Amino acid sequence: MRVKEQLLTLRAYVPGKNIEEVKREYGLSKIVKLASNENPFGCSARVTEALTSLASQYALYPDGYAFELRTKVAEHLGVKAEQLLFGSGLDEVIQMISRALLHEGTNVVMANPTFSQYHHHAVIEGAKVREVPLKDGIHDLDAMLEQVDDKTKIVWICNPNNPTGTYVEKQKLLSFLESVPKSALVIMDEAYYEYAGAEDYPQTLPLLEKYGNLMILRTFSKAYGLAAFRIGYAVGNEQLIGQLEVARLPFNTSTVAQSVALAALEDQAFLQECVKKNEEGLHQYYAFCKEYNVFYYPSQTNFIFLKLGIPGNEAFERLMKKGYIVRSGAAFGIHDGIRITVGLKEENDEIIELLKELVNEQVKKEETYS
């Protein structure tokens, strides 16, 4: 028995090493994971309260339509409930959209590097993938527009972008939306939206009324700290969302996920405190990079991408031996960089000291051979 030919060209997603695995392999008692862009401050205390109230519902199927959460999210965003599509994390939302829109003979346009699942699901559905290199770490919308034709079903824009943390400015996005064919669905993946504080970062929700081919993705996994529960959503044209609902599994988001997302949404004070502390953490890294002349991308997310002057895989291994798990840029095709999730202040302090050691050692090596 053979699967689709295109599946043979892909690899299953392999997450980074887990904490217990690293402890065993390196004989360490303390591990700090700064590789998956999780919220180091956890989630709202209201989430724990919500969990305690669910014991009597474990044997029951969840509300497939997620009515209560849908209503509250719609109210929070200022959109209609019918404009929302919920999924088991944005991974499932991306899968649903790809399954519904793509097939052999169609294509998608995206940046490179960016979030890998856009490419993954396009290939599974038999669509061609047109990747456009980032320009100075940012989506090159002009070059992406040149790749769009009458066969283009989706244009993916990860904003802010993973893995660089950079963003597309408002005016550039507006110009792109005016120019791109209406037959192509422009999807703004805003998984890190809550962290984006730049003045010219585009507020896309008000654009939905004018641009019927615009869709926005957001999640509870990042700033809300609910990665374990897997829940995200799309916001878009009411008619298209209704059609996509057909591709959604009947009970795709659990009662637990819906309940904790609702609780987290109601605690905006906790969210804003996380965003504030994250900004402070980013500035710890900025100060280090400027002092040690380390290249970095200014970030609108809860992570930073930087280049230490050594291969990313080497930096990854050496930091892991010290108890710090980061993400090598090699995973994204940027072999001389690493991506680091902003952690607690003391975690940032500790890993920055390790980064200083790596930079100083590299400088000494270069001086020796010069």
From Swiss-Prot:
It catalyses: L-histidinol phosphate + 2-oxoglutarate = 3-(imidazol-4-yl)-2-oxopropyl phosphate + L-glutamate. PROSITE patterns: AA_TRANSFER_CLASS_2. The modification N6-(pyridoxal phosphate)lysine is found at K222. Keywords: Amino-acid biosynthesis, Aminotransferase, Histidine biosynthesis, Pyridoxal phosphate, Transferase. It is an enzyme of class 2 (transferase). PANTHER family: HISTIDINOL-PHOSPHATE AMINOTRANSFERASE (PTHR43643:SF3), HISTIDINOL-PHOSPHATE AMINOTRANSFERASE 2 (PTHR43643). Belongs to the class-II pyridoxal-phosphate-dependent aminotransferase family. Histidinol-phosphate aminotransferase subfamily. This is Histidinol-phosphate aminotransferase 1. It comes from Bacillus cereus (strain ATCC 10987 / NRS 248).
